Amino acid sequence: MDPNCSCAAGGSCTCAGSCKCKDCRCTSCKKSCCSCCPAGCARCAQGCICKGASDKCSCCA
């Protein structure tokens, strides 16, 4: 569990734009969990690797 997030990994949570999770794995999280992921990335919470400061990452390219 992310110490900055009150939800269990892979569970549902109330994360929104104000989510402070640094490594959120919530399936219901609507926030872009990676700084490079677009908000609509459905696989964001499955653990992506960012490729620099662009909008591309390993799961949302």
UniProtKB/Swiss-Prot annotation:
Residues 30-61 are annotated as: Alpha. A divalent metal cation 7 binds at C50, C57, C59, C60. A divalent metal cation 4 binds at C33, C34, C44, C48. A divalent metal cation 2 binds at C7, C13, C15, C26. It comes from the Eukaryota. A divalent metal cation 5 binds at C34, C36, C37, C50. Residues 1-29 are annotated as: Beta. A divalent metal cation 3 binds at C15, C19, C24, C29. The modification N-acetylmethionine is found at M1. Keywords: Acetylation, Metal-binding, Metal-thiolate cluster. A divalent metal cation 1 binds at C5, C7, C21, C24. A divalent metal cation 6 binds at C37, C41, C44, C60. Monomer. Class I metallothioneins contain 2 metal-binding domains: four divalent ions are chelated within cluster A of the alpha domain and are coordinated via cysteinyl thiolate bridges to 11 cysteine ligands. Cluster B, the corresponding region within the beta domain, can ligate three divalent ions to 9 cysteines. Belongs to the metallothionein superfamily. Type 1 family. Metallothioneins have a high content of cysteine residues that bind various heavy metals; these proteins are transcriptionally regulated by both heavy metals and glucocorticoids. This is Metallothionein-2B. It comes from Sus scrofa. The gene is MT2B.
